[in-house]
Amino acid sequence: KVGCVVVGVDREIRSTGFNGFPRGISDDLERLSDREKKYPLICHAEENAIMHAARIGLSLKGCTAYVTWPPCTRCARSLIQAGVIEVVYPAGSEVPERWIPDFEMSTQMLDEAGLTIRKA
C-alpha cells in the first residue's frame, strides 16, 4: 500500500521501496493479518529504498523521495541521514488519525533539517 521512489538531480530513478518484510523473512498470511506480529518486522517503503541503494553502493545524497504518505518519524530520520533533500507526497493525503502526531513531528524534523517538503 505504501511506496517510495527516489530520484536523482536528473530525475533518474535511483532506488525504489515498498512496505514489506526484510529479505528472507516469510510474509505468510498469519503475520500479515496480525498487527502485533507484522509491525515489528515490517520495513517501511522509505527504509527499503534507502537500504536497497546502500546494498548496491548507491548514494542518495541530493536526491528527492516521492512517497505515498508523509513519512513517519522513523523514515524521516532515515531520509535525513541518507542525504535526501526533498520529500514529495500527494496533496490531500488522508492520514489515519492515530498517525497524525507522528507525521506532525516528522514534518518538524524534515523542516528543521532543511529538507524541502512538497505536496503535489
Feature locations, PLM:
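Zinc-dependent deaminase catalytic domain
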Residues: 1-120
